[in-house]
Swiss-Prot record:
The gene is rpmI. GO terms for molecular function: structural constituent of ribosome. The keyword Transmembrane helix does not apply. This is Large ribosomal subunit protein bL35. It holds the Pfam family Ribosomal_L35p.
Length: 65
């Protein structure tokens, strides 16, 4: 049976945690930041976790994670 290819875009966006979850970065923090409130930018800074609803898709994209 051939090896399964990892989706390279997903490999760059998600990191697996020790407990089996996936860390991700929040969206809306790359450009056009002047009109966004400081509070909004501050809350977007820490890493988020992939929800359990999306976990099936992420695991399918990262078969060896």
């Amino acid at each position: 049976m051939p090896k399964i290819k990892t989706v390279r875009g997903a490999a760059k966006r998600f990191k697996k945690t020790g407990s089996g979850g996936f860390k991700r970065k929040h969206a809306n923090l790359r450009h056009i930041l002047t009109k966004k409130a400081t509070k909004r930018k501050r809350h977007l800074r820490p890493k988020g976790m992939v929800s359990k609803n999306d976990m099936v898709l992420v695991v399918a994209c990262l078969p060896y994670a």
